[in-house]
Amino acid sequence: MQLALTRTRWTLAAAVAILAAFAVASGTLWQVQHRADKIAVAMTGGDIARAPDLIRRYGCAGCHTIPGIPGGDGQVGGPLQDIKRRVYVGGVAVNSPDNMIKWIVSPQTFSPRSAMPATGISETEARDVAAYLYSR
């Protein structure tokens, strides 16, 4: 009987420890993502929350793999994860928020033969999309 109680206590203690570790890890991940979001918004002046709808509306996911976008698994254009770590936008312009926004609005300005179409997205909308991409 005493052995059974000891096992139960150890099992409960282990479960509590695992849950506590999970809570700490989840909180840390949330803090990291929240910080990345704040930095991306400051860099671009965009609104991350509006980006998923814009990405769907303008068909970005039809060509690109985009993290966090359901169905964002296109294979025509380059994948859009870790944009903040890239040296170039579209392979031709130095990666900066201004260049990213200009590229999203009018890729042919940088590369006349680019396969990426001008979608008609506004500069404000491009800022939102850029903020989202830089935050991921």
Annotate each predicted stretch with a short phrase.
Residues 1-3, 80:
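Terminal targeting segments of Actinobacterial cell-envelope proteins
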Residues 31-56:
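Electrostatic cytochrome c docking/interface patches
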Residues 56-62, 67, 84, 125:
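Short pre-active-site segment immediately N-terminal to redox-active cysteine/selenocysteine motifs
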Residues 15-18, 34-41, 70:
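Short low-complexity stretches enriched in small and charged residues
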Residues 1, 30-36, 64:
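Extended interaction regions within the primary functional domain
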Residues 49-53, 61, 78:
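Internal, well-ordered alpha-helical scaffold/interface segments
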Residues 4-31, 109, 115-136:
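C-terminal capping alpha-helices of c-type cytochrome domains
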Residues 71-136:
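Extracytoplasmic electron-transfer domains, predominantly the class I c-type cytochrome c fold
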